[in-house]
Amino acid sequence: MLSRYIRLCGTASDAVKLETLSLGERYSMGCFSNKKRVVIIAGETSGDLHGAKLVKAMQKRNKGLFFCGIGGQALRETGVDILIDAREISVVGITEVFSKVPNILRSLRMVKKTFKTMRPDLLILIDFPDFNLHVAATAKKMGIPVLYYISPQIWAWRPGRVKKIEKLVDHMAVILPFEEDFYRKQKIPVTFVGHPLLENSLPTAQRIEDKWKDDVPAIGLLPGSRHGEIERHLPIMIDAARILLKRIQTIKFIISLSPDVEEKHVKEIVRKHKGEADFEIAAGNVRKVLEGSKVVMAASGTVTLESAISGTPMVIIYKVSPVSFRLGKAMIRVKNIGLVNLIAGKEIVPELIQEEASSTRIADTVFKMLSDPSGLKQLSLELLALRDKLGGPGASERVADIAFRMLEK
């Protein structure tokens, strides 16, 4: 952090003093008034990771940029000045949002104050639509250009939000192939940039082949990246694991721990529910879990797509509060909720949602998949084929192209 302030303001003695000052105070002192200023907002773990890749791509081309905004560990590590930690405002479900309302309102005020203080040259929004569209409205009033990277799933539910996007967003950078046509039909400027997950090192066909040679099956548990998701999903997954252990005594279990989740919290849930089963916890390394598992139990979200491009079969599960589920169900316009199935255009992996996501049902589904090795291997190949629909590597570079064009206007 100190070295970054030295780069911004020139001397070590100045930098030591500046670390104690607010963003507004530093701006008023001219620390980065000669730099292009970019505000980036990512309210979820996946957005934080993708945002960090974008920031790195932009920094590689131009060191004379100043970034600040809302995010998590990944964005912070790139040098983004984090005004608010994303965990303070991240939430899943409709009724679940009420507990975060004070934090959300405080964060909106902070963003508005930041806009007035330093007048950014560009606002980059990453998914997280209910919060980000409020921010976009403020930016629009102030004449700040808005780039929206990773579209809200308005093609799936609450399609009326497209009218807001049309009014508030200057350019959409979308990561799913069918989203480009959706926005073009609405005459909204859009570019399909491909999926940023393809920028990660991908397992080779040989590595996937080796996984099937292991006689001892390992099952991955991917309960989500938010506190509420883990509270709802992990106990059910652990109970399902205990049922599976009674049927397959040699089975192993690995829990994927998101970088933004405290390990002690997960360990406490495991302690309460594990019974005779043993669980390895893989902190911050979902790739290790995917590459080591023949099947994963995965909370619906980005990680299901990551499972697909690694060729790992999965059971998608999801639970929210009963009220959130009823309200959400009334607004959903698609048959499947899993990204894997949406991109495939059919259900290629099972989805167990709400009441269907019981420990018994999950265990039965996983056991059935493990009992058909040839079918499981064929499913792995189907999942790998989805890579071809995701645009190839280079998403961050393509979004950076758009960002720099907008900065130059």
Kindly give the residue locations of the regions a language model identified.
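Nucleotide-activated sugar donor-binding and catalytic core shared by glycosyltransferases
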Residues: L2-C9, V16-L18, S22-K409
